[in-house]
Amino acid sequence: MKKSLVLKASVAVATLVPMLSFAAEGDDPAKAAFNSLQASATEYIGYAWAMVVVIVGATIGIKLFKKFTSKAS
């Protein structure tokens, strides 16, 4: 009885240890997905800042144009 219990425990440990090390060393698909999402978000933020500069510049230009045309009239 005691030998079979020791044998079963050693078999269980022998099967669990390689599985745990394989799980720890493998690539995590969720981590890869979040890294890809972060890269895309960073790219889109860069595009957004370019649009902010264009919109603010156009708004200031329109206001200055209105100001100078009203003074010229």
Curated annotation (Swiss-Prot):
Subcellular location per the Swiss-Prot or TrEMBL entry: Virion; Host cell inner membrane
InterPro entries in the cross-refs:
G8P, Phage_M13_G8P_capsid_dom_sf
List membrane-spanning regions. Answer: 48-68
Family annotation (Pfam families): Phage_coatGP8
User: What ranges are annotated Periplasmic (topological domains)?
Assistant: 24-47
Q: Which residues lie on this side of the membrane: Cytoplasmic?
A: 69-73
Q: One cellular component GO annotation, for this chain's record?
A: host cell plasma membrane
Q: How does it sit in the membrane?
A: Single-pass type I membrane protein
Signal sequence annotation:
1-23
Keywords, A to Z? Capsid protein, Helical capsid protein, Host cell inner membrane, Host cell membrane, Host membrane, Membrane, Signal, Transmembrane, Transmembrane helix, Virion
Query: What is the protein's quaternary organization?
Result: Homomultimerizes. There are about 2,700 copies of this protein in the phage capsid.
Family from the record = Belongs to the inovirus capsid protein family.
Describe the task this protein carries out: Self assembles to form a helical capsid wrapping up the viral genomic DNA. The capsid displays a filamentous structure with a length of 760-1950 nm and a width of 6-8 nm. The virion assembly and budding take place at the host inner membrane.
This chain's protein is named Capsid protein G8P
Q: Which organism is it from?
A: Enterobacteria phage M13
Gene label: VIII
